[in-house]
Amino acid sequence: MAGNSIGQLFKVTTFGESHGIALGCIVDGVPPNMELSEADLQPDLDRRKPGTSRYTTPRREDDEVQILSGVFEGKTTGTSIGLIIKNGDQRSKDYGDIMDKFRPGHADYTYQQKYGIRDYRGGGRSSARETAMRVAAGAIAKKYLKEQFGVEIRGYLSQIGSVKIDPQTVANIEQIDWQQVNSNPFFCPDPVAVEQFDELIRELKKEGNSIGAKLTVIAENVPVGLGEPVFDRLDADLAHALMSINAVKGVEIGDGFAAVEQKGSEHRDEMTPEGFCSNHSGGILGGISSGQPIIAHIALKPTSSITVPGKSVNVHNEPVEVVTKGRHDPCVGIRAVPIAEAMMAIVVLDHLLRFKAQCR
């Protein structure tokens, strides 16, 4: 199975399954002499881990990361950093009923058709549990970016189902209340929307159903010049990284699809000696960072793991009914904010190292 790595100079390779012994990753390209310990990685993992609120899956995992290599006397050595997280709260018996069934909307069918075998326990490798290692690796990237270049990467949830935040709460990046974002389980900057999200999720849990979400991730203080046209454009690599997150079905950079209804006189980011007058492009022009904040939005589908019965087939292509009995999130977007931050950090650091190697 290929496709387990991302990045060129800053390269992350993950391994492990949802109900396996452990999850792990190898992080190559971390510059030497950066102070690093598990305590630097754990806060982001705690933001992502399951069982932290009544709005997410009841599966409880400590997600305590251990650094296996690449750090000596509290500093990175420049060699590969090995990370591991032990799985602890697997309940594989919950998946006995779907051993030979394909859950509609999941990767069960395609994995079976491609490989002729699949780990049906919690989705195996296709489970979002794998993203814990992305968050751990991303925390390394975020730390280096902030300490060495002042780059800060943060995200927030802007929509669950048809419930949207007040756009005025995020109209100006400098005025986003990040304390509010970090003080509620939805990572939401709008306190009114938090109450509406709460009500919506409660109803969905009663129904045994799920819902989709939209979130935004922003990188501030990114220097001008990151990105390698034409095929390694910064926005192309960001889209690739963000689309690789489980359940993501759409990515927008800047105004994204809203640009369809804009005129050129509106969408172009005019400039003055003092700087740009707008940021419709999301901080990227011609595939290269412009020095403005990089803004990306992602849409996540509603999880297909629900207790509402659904039609499907089994491995013998016979019709069956599927009812998911495992523990799942009613809205996967709630825990996706730190994952999106991690993927943006991995891409930005990779391109920053490539920029330094080529241009300065």
From Swiss-Prot:
Annotated positions binding NADP(+): 48, 54
Record: residues binding FMN: 125-127, 246-247, 286, 301-305, 327
A GO cellular component entry from the record: cytosol
Keywords (A to Z) from UniProt: Amino-acid biosynthesis, Aromatic amino acid biosynthesis, FAD, Flavoprotein, FMN, Lyase, NADP
Top-level taxon: Bacteria
Pathway field: Metabolic intermediate biosynthesis; chorismate biosynthesis; chorismate from D-erythrose 4-phosphate and phosphoenolpyruvate: step 7/7
Keyword match Electron transport: no
Alphabetized GO MF terms: chorismate synthase activity; FMN binding
CDD domains to which the protein is assigned, alphabetical: Chorismate_synthase (cd07304)
Cofactors (names): FMNH2
Family annotation (Gene3D superfamilies): Chorismate synthase AroC
GO BP annotations, alphabetical order: amino acid biosynthetic process; aromatic amino acid family biosynthetic process; chorismate biosynthetic process
EC category name: lyase
Cofactor binding remark: Reduced FMN (FMNH(2)).
InterPro entries referenced in this protein's UniProt entry, alphabetically: Chorismate_synth, Chorismate_synth_AroC_sf, Chorismate_synthase_CS
Quaternary structure and partners: Homotetramer.
Reported function: This reaction introduces a second double bond into the aromatic ring system.
Stated family: Belongs to the chorismate synthase family.
Protein name: Chorismate synthase
Organism: Glaesserella parasuis serovar 5 (strain SH0165)
The organism's taxonomic lineage, starting at the top: Bacteria, Pseudomonadati, Pseudomonadota, Gammaproteobacteria, Pasteurellales
